[in-house]
């Protein structure tokens, strides 16, 4: 099974924390979509005939894309790849884009999972992060989606925001749970160079929270969500049983995926490819760059990605894929963390 990823890089407003590639020039939407269709045709052999299990629209803000255009990309992909077994089609959205009319057309297009970028249910926190929506709009967006029949909704939350402690975080977690969503991704705020927060930090006007605060807030997220029946199945991801993110699992488990659009990444099992991070250059046809992974690269990625998940490393699988020597080395290198109980070894798995 394989995955398809479509990158829609446009945003109406740049969030204060975001260091992803994005563009605010929405006039380029139509030329970009035409180029994405051309890239689909050009890379029709990339997945080697593997059936597509998941499809994902990320950004940027994919909900700025007309639902008819989303349908066009999905329909085109279905003529090139075997999408008959596709189980999950996700679109990332800002709350203020999710009108009933938009949601209805999107659902008919085949989108069956929404990822709503709420980040916080506190208006002051949202304003600090330069988000477009407010808390009331976030609540209404999820409720509108539920009324339109969406039964698989995930929301993003951010914790570790300076000036907003446990009480604010607890209220946001409680608000998300009260909405009855099936999945919650909780990310710690990182202050990156080149972002609004990064520039303020460089001027001494913004300071990240300390490590003790980070640990306390992460523990609060874990305890609150697992206490509500969610599985903490990956570092930042929590799901009710049966609602884990299938597309993201492709990245953590070495599954093939094809990325379409500027700055999109792809993996065919041996090589990683990435498109130029520029709408202008992408439309102009700048070719993707590639890196062939050595066995050592693949092994290191295997260890790092598996340790992000609750299942961890299956040592028998590691031995089968990379040989006894490398599997044994994992155990040797992990010994200090096993002794401190930071890692646990049980039934042939280390997590």
Tell what function each PLM region has:
Residues 1-8:
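Immediate flanking context of iron-sulfur cluster ligation sites
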Residues 238, 347-350:
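Short, Lys/Arg-rich nucleic-acid/phosphate-binding segment
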Residues 324-339:
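Short amphipathic alpha-helical interaction segments
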């Amino acid at each position: 099974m394989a995955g398809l990823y479509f990158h829609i890089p446009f945003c109406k407003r740049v969030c204060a924390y975001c260091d992803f590639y994005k563009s605010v020039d929405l006039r380029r939407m139509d030329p970009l979509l035409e180029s994405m269709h051309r890239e689909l045709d050009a890379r029709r052999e990339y997945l080697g005939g593997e059936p597509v299990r998941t499809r994902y629209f990320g950004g940027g803000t994919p909900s700025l894309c007309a639902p008819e255009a989303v349908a066009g990309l999905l329909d085109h992909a279905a003529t090139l790849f075997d999408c008959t077994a596709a189980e999950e089609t996700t679109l990332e959205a800002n709350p203020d884009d999710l009108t009933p009319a938009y949601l209805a057309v999107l659902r008919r297009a085949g989108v069956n999972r929404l990822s709503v970028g709420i980040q916080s249910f506190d208006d002051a926190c949202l304003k600090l992060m330069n988000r477009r929506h407010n808390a009331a709009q976030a609540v209404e967006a999820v409720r509108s989606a539920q009324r339109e029949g969406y039964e698989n909704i995930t929301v993003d939350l951010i914790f570790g925001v300076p000036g907003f402690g446990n009480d604010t975080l607890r209220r946001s977690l409680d608000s998300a749970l009260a909405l009855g969503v099936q999945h919650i991704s909780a990310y710690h705020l990182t202050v990156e160079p080149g972002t609004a927060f990064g520039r303020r930090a460089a001027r001494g006007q913004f300071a990240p929270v300390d490590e003790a605060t980070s640990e306390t807030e992460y523990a609060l997220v874990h305890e609150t969500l697992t206490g509500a029946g969610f599985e903490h199945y990956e570092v930042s991801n929590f799901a009710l049983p049966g609602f884990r993110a299938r597309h993201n699992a492709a990245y953590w488990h070495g599954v093939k995926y094809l990325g379409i659009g500027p700055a999109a990444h792809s993996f065919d099992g041996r090589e990683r490819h990435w498109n130029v991070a520029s709408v202008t250059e992408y439309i102009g046809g700048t070719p993707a760059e590639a890196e062939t992974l050595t066995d050592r690269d693949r092994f290191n990625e295997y260890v790092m990605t598996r340790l992000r998940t609750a299942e961890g490393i299956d040592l028998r699988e590691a031995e089968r894929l990379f040989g006894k020597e490398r599997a044994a080395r994992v155990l040797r290198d992990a010994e200090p963390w096993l002794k401190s109980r930071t890692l646990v070894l049980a039934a042939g798995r280390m997590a």
